[in-house]
């Protein structure tokens, strides 16, 4: 009828079913046509007018929706759907408190409260009012013990409130009523995992996968928990089950690779890291894991190749640049190492080790003034560090500013005398200088 424009008579219930069907499957143009035909045949139907309003709201025609809703409210001021649609409209306008007021009014007008509790929960979530959101979702779960969407939302609220023990208490009560619910066992396991109670988490995940042997999420969390407990081979076995039950994921391949690495099986680790980047070539972390394993094997050429892959995907991670520089140092590519450490600093990685590494490379290539500038920057965030003061002393000495060199050497010795050996490693000419030796000797005697 709707596609041919032939007109037939339908009773009101049939029209409502047709319209709701089209709305549910996303064919709103056909739903609108059905509403139009329905109102032509049943012009006084409030339910059809409410469906018309719902379609207006969906299309963001809020002014028209409000106008139509006002007309309906005059006819049926105590219709709960009027207040639900009012709530939907003002919610779209960002007026979530007003939406809540309308939904609370709707609650007083109907015995079918579950959908309204769900809508209330969502409105409270918009306001980050997790406690009230949780209470409404709990109402949904109490009304329908198999409302798993609301169950997830309850746990989400507990998570956002960081009330993990309270979540466990709630889930235990839920499990008492519905003991064969794999979703609840999975969620209680997650709460135990957050609290680092891994043995209890493992038991919960075991129940989840016993109840549903095809529950991928249960096996995945079980594998992660076994990994946390150091049971790497068992973790691998469970990750492999997830690959059998569902499509392969780069995440699972990476986790298997890490487990093999923990077991000392580098060859297997490399195999699975390569599977991970094959599955997801844009997984920068996968390329980094390959980098690290080849770095540990002292295969710096391959490590350099893989870190370049990681950086081509994500060049905003200081960790990648730090590894890049460490590799370049091993290959004696000093200018590239300098570039990498400078990138770390520009990305906000102001760890003292980054500053020191950059200073040492600049010193090695004879860029003493540049090294001094970096030390000055380092000192702003790292005061009274022997690592910095001894390098100040050495650099000032090399730049023929012995007065400053002596000041920093004395300061360095007061912080950590034994660390003066760094002068021998980095500034041998300064270390063996007669004046330096006398300062070191005199300080030691004075402090004995």
Model-inferred region functions:
Residues 41, 74-76, 109-110, 143-144, ...:
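Structural marker of alpha-solenoid helical repeat scaffolds
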């Amino acid at each position: 009828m709707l596609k041919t424009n032939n007109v037939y008579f339908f009773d009101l219930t049939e029209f409502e079913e047709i319209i709701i069907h089209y709305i549910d499957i996303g064919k709103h143009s056909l739903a609108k046509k059905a509403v139009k035909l329905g109102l032509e045949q049943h012009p006084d139907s409030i339910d059809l007018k409410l469906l018309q309003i719902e379609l207006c709201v969906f299309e963001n025609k809020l002014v028209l929706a409000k106008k139509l809703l006002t007309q309906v409210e005059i006819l049926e001021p105590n219709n709960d759907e009027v207040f639900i649609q009012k709530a939907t409209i003002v919610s779209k306008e960002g007026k979530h408190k007003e939406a809540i007021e309308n939904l609370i009014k709707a609650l007083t007008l109907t015995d079918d409260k579950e959908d309204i509790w769900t809508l209330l929960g969502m409105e409270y979530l918009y306001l980050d009012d997790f406690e009230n959101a949780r209470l409404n979702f709990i109402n949904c779960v109490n009304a329908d013990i198999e409302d798993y969407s609301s169950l997830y939302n309850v746990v989400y609220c507990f998570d956002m409130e960081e009330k993990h023990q309270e979540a466990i208490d709630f889930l235990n009560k839920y499990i008492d009523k519905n003991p064969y619910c794999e979703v609840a066992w999975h969620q209680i396991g997650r709460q135990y995992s957050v609290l680092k109670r891994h043995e209890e988490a493992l038991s919960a995940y075991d129940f989840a996968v016993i109840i549903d042997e095809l529950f991928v999420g249960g096996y995945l969390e079980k594998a992660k928990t076994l990994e946390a407990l150091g049971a790497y081979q068992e973790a691998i076995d469970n990750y492999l089950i997830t690959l059998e039950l569902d499509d392969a994921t780069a995440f699972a391949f990476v986790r298997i690779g890490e487990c093999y690495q923990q077991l000392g099986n580098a060859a297997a680790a490399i195999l699975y890291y390569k599977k991970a980047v094959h599955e997801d070539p844009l997984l920068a972390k996968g390329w980094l894991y390959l980098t690290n394993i080849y770095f540990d094997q002292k295969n710096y050429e391959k490590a350099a190749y893989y870190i370049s892959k990681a950086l081509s995907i994500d060049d905003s991670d200081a960790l990648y640049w730090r590894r890049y520089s460490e590799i370049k140092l091993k290959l004696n590519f000093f200018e590239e190492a300098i570039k990498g450490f400078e990138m770390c600093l520009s990305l906000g990685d102001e760890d003292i080790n980054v500053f020191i590494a950059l200073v040492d490379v600049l010193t090695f290539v004879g860029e003493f003034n540049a090294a001094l500038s970096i030390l000055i920057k380092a000192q702003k965030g790292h005061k009274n560090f022997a690592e910095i003061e001894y390098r100040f002393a050495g650099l000032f000495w090399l730049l023929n500013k012995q007065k400053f060199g002596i000041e920093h050497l004395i300061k360095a010795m007061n912080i950590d005398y034994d660390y003066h050996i760094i002068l021998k490693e980095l500034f041998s000419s300064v270390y063996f200088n007669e004046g330096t030796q006398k300062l070191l000797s005199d300080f030691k005697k004075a402090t004995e």
